[in-house]
């Protein structure tokens, strides 16, 4: 694997569904960690406040529920991912690319139906806690959602 002129490695998993979340804002995640890669082959990833034994995007904030939401692949060709709120108090919100307003997926303490995500949607976890831009690419990552060769900008989803 060789890097391009920007030090970014090409994607080697072209046949597998991946979703990239580009951090737009967060009070709880390290500043230099900007991209989370969700692998759709293994059931996706949970989002929550506490540590977990399964892949998780951990957001240690009281505004985020212990088991806040799930992201998962619903189609490989074309690549499709969905998000579902698991009954959080402060909500999971999605703003479509062409919209200026957010839609809450479900009322407080009620699980939502899966919401199909589209390229460049914005997902907000909690009222104002953390926001991510959704990136769904058929092939290589764009400059905004690429992880550098050193991996320094990747948000780990490993079980903790």
Model-predicted segments: where are they?
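Intrinsically disordered, low-complexity acidic Ser/Thr-rich regulatory segments
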Residues: 1-62, 76-78, 116, 121, ...
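Forkhead-associated
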Residues: 55-56, 68-122, 126
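Amphipathic hydrophobic-ligand
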Residues: 64-66
